[in-house]
From Swiss-Prot:
Mn(2+) 2 binds at D13, S63, D443, H444. Binds 2 manganese ions per subunit. Monomer. Catalyzes the interconversion of 2-phosphoglycerate and 3-phosphoglycerate. Belongs to the BPG-independent phosphoglycerate mutase family. GO terms for molecular function: manganese ion binding; phosphoglycerate mutase activity. Its cofactor is Mn(2+). NCBIfam families: pgm_bpd_ind, PRK05434.1-5. The gene is gpmI. InterPro entries: Alkaline_phosphatase_core_sf (IPR017850), BPG-indep_PGM_N (IPR011258), Metalloenzyme (IPR006124), PGAM_B_sf (IPR036646), Pgm_bpd_ind (IPR005995). This is 2,3-bisphosphoglycerate-independent phosphoglycerate mutase. GO terms for cellular component: cytosol. Mn(2+) 1 binds at D402, H406, H462.
Length: 513
């Protein structure tokens, strides 16, 4: 087999750029490798947020959006934008899957349960979408409407859920029907790393009202959680009862509508409700329900979808397949879906010639406890893959900046950045030995802003800052004004290949030779 000259793309998750050095873990980290690369090779800053990635203007980027834009080589208009537009255009209340779920529950004298991340963060969901669903259910005649609120504190300030919970109490009062039936932190309900002990707590809360606590109102439950020193993300399972002390549990003939639009943290809990042979934990109750996913969460989940995804053709992965090129996707479990499913435009199956390596993320409660995560093991596998000269293209995601940045722990985020920098050194060295090249970038910012100057709280969300773009290869100039969708066309050009017409991005590297 002929040896390959690999082109590697290293995605440093959550690694943005900011002139503000205060509470900036990226700035304060000791990163001799990246410092040297920036001094020796062409580099620039590119956009990974807002309208440049198909989000509303000013909206921070996120990992799903970033990887879809990088992998598809075009601006992909995101579900947040698409669903918000449907609501504004009054198309949402006519959505066939949503209407059918509400109507079936009403006809069977059942309840309409609505679950999702109650957040204005706009990363996994938006509370405006949840409000529209509550309104639509009542307007179609549902009198039993129950909200199961997953609390954020990760893409929003750590203690910011109160206004949302109060607003929904007021909303239900104005509608004359419905109430909040439970609250729980996203740490439990939205796990994506097969920690079924967490997900089971959310499942039992919704199906049995089995929580650690019971309260008469959601704001009261939140206040008690704060008194226990639980931020929104970690709020323990709390059932909310009505004036008669009755809980609302998911029962036969009810409908359950999941209002998250992002797939990766929606899959696990969805499977607990819809997979008859689910075995992640023992389910005490398995009610026969009508379940609706807001968007496609996974190809193997058999449930109606309110907003099916549009097909993206000639993504980078598909183009490499058509060119008979070999490719490797590698990351830890936390970002594995991003370098595979999302990078491939929502396609689960690997392309011909595409290999995948999954490294288990550490089993710790939060990643500030192990800021290096599994970066050493990941880099061991990556270096071996480079040395094998088996691959034309390698896509790797280092999750540390994002996953540790979300903890709000500045010192840990600094250590995370330093760990990644050391790994990059090993990768660049391995590539040099096989005459390979490397692009280094990020999908969005996070670790460069670890404190919110407006309130002094830890800043755990993403940012809309520009992200780095470094080319470790031939003598070249990088054009200004780049964005994530320019990366795939640039990679194909570096490989001497033409850019598919479906890719609206442009090559932003001019080779001097």
């Amino acid at each position: 087999m002929a040896k390959k000259r690999p082109l590697a793309l290293l995605i440093l998750d959550g690694w943005g750029y900011s002139e503000d050095t205060q509470d900036n873990a990226v700035f304060h980290a000791n990163t001799p490798v990246l410092d040297k690369l920036n001094a020796q090779y062409p580099h620039s800053l590119i956009s990974g947020s807002g309208i440049d990635v198909g989000l509303p203007d000013g909206q921070m980027g996120n990992s799903e959006v970033g990887h879809i834009n990088i992998g598809s080589g075009r601006i992909v208009y995101q579900e947040l934008t698409r669903i918000s537009k449907a609501i504004a255009d009054h198309e949402f209340e006519q959505n066939a899957a949503l209407c059918d779920a509400v109507d079936k529950a009403i006809a069977a004298n059942g309840a309409v349960h609505i679950m999702g991340l109650l957040s204005a963060g706009g990363v996994h969901s938006h509370e405006e979408h949840i409000e529209a669903m509550c309104r639509m259910a009542v307007e179609r005649g549902a009198t039993k409407v129950y909200l199961h609120a997953f609390l954020d504190g990760r893409d929003t300030p750590p203690r910011s859920a109160k206004n949302s919970l109060v607003h929904f109490d007021e909303l239900f009062a104005s509608l004359g029907h419905g109430r909040t039936a439970s609250i729980i932190g996203r740490y439990f309900a939205m796990d994506r790393d097969n920690r079924w002990d967490r997900v089971s707590q959310a499942y039992e809360l919704i199906t049995e009202a089995k929580g650690k606590f019971t309260y008469a109102s959601a704001p009261e439950a939140l206040e008690a959680a704060y008194a226990r020193d639980e931020n929104d993300e970690f709020v323990a399972a709390s059932a909310i009862v009505d004036a008669q002390g009755e809980a609302a549990v998911l029962s036969d003939n009810d409908s359950l509508i999941f209002m998250n639009f992002r797939a990766d943290r929606a899959r696990q809990i969805t499977r607990t409700f819809v997979n008859p042979d689910f075995d992640g934990f023992k389910r005490n109750k398995t009610p026969k329900i009508n379940f609706v996913m807001l968007t496609d969460y996974a190809a193997d989940i058999n449930a109606p979808v309110a907003y099916p995804s549009s097909d993206l053709v000639n993504t980078l992965g598909e183009t490499l397949q058509n060119l008979d090129k070999t490719q490797l996707r590698i990351s830890e479990t936390e970002k594995y879906a991003h370098v595979t499913f999302f990078f491939n435009g929502g396609k689960e199956e690997p392309f011909e010639g595409e290999d995948r390596i999954l490294i288990q993320s550490p089993k710790v409660a939060t990643y500030d406890l192990q800021p290096e995560m599994s970066s050493t093991e990941l880099t061991d596998k990556l270096v071996a893959a480079i040395e094998s000269t088996k691959y034309d293209v390698i896509i790797c995601n280092y999750p540390n900046g994002d996953m540790v940045g979300h903890s709000g722990n500045f010192d840990a985020a600094v250590k995370a950045c330093e760990a990644v920098d050391a790994c990059i050194g090993r990768v660049v060295e391995a590539l040099a030995k096989v005459d390979g090249e490397c692009l280094i970038t990020a999908d969005h910012g996070n670790a460069e802003k670890m404190k919110d100057p407006s309130n002094g709280q830890a800043f755990t969300a993403h940012t809309s800052n520009l992200v780095p773009f470094v080319y470790v290869g031939r003598d070249a100039v990088i054009k200004d004004g780049g964005r994530l969708s320019d990366i795939a066309p640039t990679m194909l050009t570096l490989m001497g290949q033409s850019i598919p017409k479906e890719m609206s991005g442009r090559c932003i590297i001019d080779l001097k030779e």
